[in-house]
């Protein structure tokens, strides 16, 4: 049976929705919200009714009867650290999404919106593999400063989806393989997946790992300390240097990897150096994750928007092909990944996890 699902993925100025029958997409819409509209609301949670109305209006216009849905799936938000999987939305989760226990983020509305619509039609609401998925081993959490433990914040939804896709295409299960998965987008995350769990990964938001189009990645801590206390920058300005204005933006004033690739291909000296450093840092992180997996790696999987570039993937492969074969799944399909997570539960392949 092909389940009919509504998928909701809220962003800061848009809400992406999809309607699926099984894994087949029958509708995809990006509902854009103007800055003026968003600014009317003091908090992200205050946008709930507005976003819900917009979603229901578009579904009606497109001839989608919500009463025919089997479930509603939302993008998971900044919850407490949880293990990966599909979670049924419950009151404890809704409360934590409302307050944003790990910070405010538009994705916090995903679970709440899905729950609101599912309640109206008497169906179940789910979230799948939010960014706060944390399966790190205790040994990976120590940083050298007890007050600053390493944290798991990464592209969990896409990393898990492509890892499961690899397993399926190779007639095995995610729980039976060891993979190094590299997501390359606005941020870069490199995860060590051992038998179905991401036992180590860089904090791709504001922690460590390779620099990326907009993020600094790991930086020298002594110099960062000097910068923080120099009196030249506010806390917000320093944070912007790490997230938003770091990486390619800082070095080349662009957040588009294609610009850097073009400069490198044309032999531009500065552009080539930045591009080579980007490849170098990703390859180095892959190498460290190979050590985490004791050298037992079935494959290195590259994904995210930048993985569409053969120039990038070939450059990485040149450095790491001695570790394991490389597989490339360019881009990311978050709506499909969310649908697949719900289908696994509805089909009885997995049990829905309970958020506490």
Swiss-Prot record:
One term under GO cellular component: cytoplasm
Please give the catalytic activity noted in the UniProt record: butanoate + ATP = butanoyl phosphate + ADP
Q: Name the CDD domains for this protein.
A: ASKHA_NBD_BK
What GO molecular-function term can you cite, just one?
Answer: ATP binding
**In which compartments does the protein localize?**
Cytoplasm
* Alphabetical keyword list: ATP-binding, Cytoplasm, Kinase, Nucleotide-binding, Transferase
Protein name in the entry:
Probable butyrate kinase
Species lineage: Bacteria, Bacillati, Bacillota, Clostridia, Eubacteriales
């Amino acid at each position: 049976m092909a389940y009919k699902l509504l998928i909701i993925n809220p962003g800061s100025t848009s809400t992406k929705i999809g309607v699926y029958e099984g894994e087949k997409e029958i509708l995809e819409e990006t509902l854009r919200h103007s800055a003026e509209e968003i600014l009317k609301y003091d908090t992200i949670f205050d946008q709930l009714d507005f976003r819900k109305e917009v979603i229901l209006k578009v579904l009606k216009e497109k001839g989608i009867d919500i009463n025919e849905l089997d479930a509603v799936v939302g993008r998971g938000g900044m919850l407490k650290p949880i293990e990966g999987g599909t979670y049924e939305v419950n009151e404890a989760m809704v409360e934590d999404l409302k307050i944003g226990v790990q910070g405010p983020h538009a994705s916090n509305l995903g679970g709440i919106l899905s729950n609101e619509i599912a309640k109206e039609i008497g169906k179940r609401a789910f979230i799948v593999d939010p960014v706060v998925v944390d399966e790190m081993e205790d040994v990976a959490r120590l940083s050298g400063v007890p007050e600053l433990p390493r944290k798991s914040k990464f592209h969990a939804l896409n990393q898990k989806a492509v890892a499961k896709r690899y397993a399926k295409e190779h007639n095995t299960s995610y729980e039976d393989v060891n993979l190094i998965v590299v997501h390359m987008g606005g941020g870069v995350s490199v995860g060590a997946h051992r038998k179905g769990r991401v036992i180590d990964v860089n904090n791709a938001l504001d922690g460590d790992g390779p620099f990326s189009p907009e993020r600094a990645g790991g930086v020298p801590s002594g110099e960062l300390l000097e910068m923080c206390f120099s009196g030249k920058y506010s806390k917000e300005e320093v944070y912007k240097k790490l997230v938003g204005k770091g990486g390619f933006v800082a070095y080349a004033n662009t957040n588009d990897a294609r610009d850097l690739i073009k400069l490198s291909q044309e032999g531009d000296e500065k552009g080539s150096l930045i591009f080579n450093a980007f490849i170098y840092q990703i390859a180095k992180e892959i190498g460290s994750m190979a050590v985490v997996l004791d050298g037992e790696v079935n494959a290195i999987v590259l994904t995210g928007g930048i993985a569409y570039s053969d120039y990038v993937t070939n450059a990485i492969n040149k450095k790491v092909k001695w570790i394991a074969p490389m597989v490339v799944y360019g881009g990311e399909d978050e709506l499909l990944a969310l649908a697949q997570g719900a289908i696994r539960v509805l089909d009885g392949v997995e049990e829905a996890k309970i958020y506490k």
